[in-house]
Curated annotation (Swiss-Prot):
InterPro entries: AAA+_ATPase, ABC_transporter-like_ATP-bd, ABC_transporter-like_CS, ABC_transpr_LolD-like, LolD_lipo_ATP-bd, MacB-like_ATP-bd, P-loop_NTPase. PROSITE patterns: ABC_TRANSPORTER_1 (PS00211), ABC_TRANSPORTER_2 (PS50893), LOLD (PS51244). It comes from Neisseria gonorrhoeae (strain ATCC 700825 / FA 1090). This is Lipoprotein-releasing system ATP-binding protein LolD. One of its GO terms (molecular function) is ATP binding. It holds the Pfam family ABC_tran.
Amino acid sequence: MSDLILKCEGVGKRYRDGGLDVPVLYGLDLEIRTGESTGIIGSSGSGKSTLLHILGGLDMPSEGRVLLMGEDLRALNQRRLGDLRNRHLGFVYQFHHLLPEFSALENVMMPLLIGKKSRKEAVETAMAMLDKVGLKHRSTHRAGELSGGERQRAAIARALVTQPKCLLADEPTGNLDRANARNVLDMMLELKTELGTGLVVVTHDDELAGRFERVMVMKDGSLHPRQGANA
């Protein structure tokens, strides 16, 4: 079986602004494989987040195509696209987006319940994932009772609880201090190895990006390997 999860072929993106086409991405090619970590760095407005949204099927390219597990995302109806995305992708953002009225455990359980797992199975699986991220002892605490680093750990647990093929993270440490940022990234890389999950992280932090196996630089809508980055 191929270990290829995501593939971009000639991906371009334009937006309409006042009757004009504004290009954002130009002819991008990219492959993401099982167990591989990729950092995408670039200045604000370079197109990093736009690319991540296209990789995740949250936006569609204007040109080219994106294949997820061999399926062209543009060829799918919304229901099939949602099913494929929910089954194979996890998402983490700069802000945790935990639901404040629920506990850490209930937040992490949610994707499993949406996926029609029984409550018993959801509790057991979510608790095991909270244990992996070091939050089992905080499982009954609501988001407002957790520290910033703990909230992001809970968000990562929620993204990985369904064991997706790939985790897409948009500035996941951008709202944390340096120590917490390092700890969260360490945890993500450990879980990537343990679970065999592909990992794509958009970041402006050059130091953190150096921890990934591959680093790509986004500049003026084009994507290139960083010179001297790990292969």
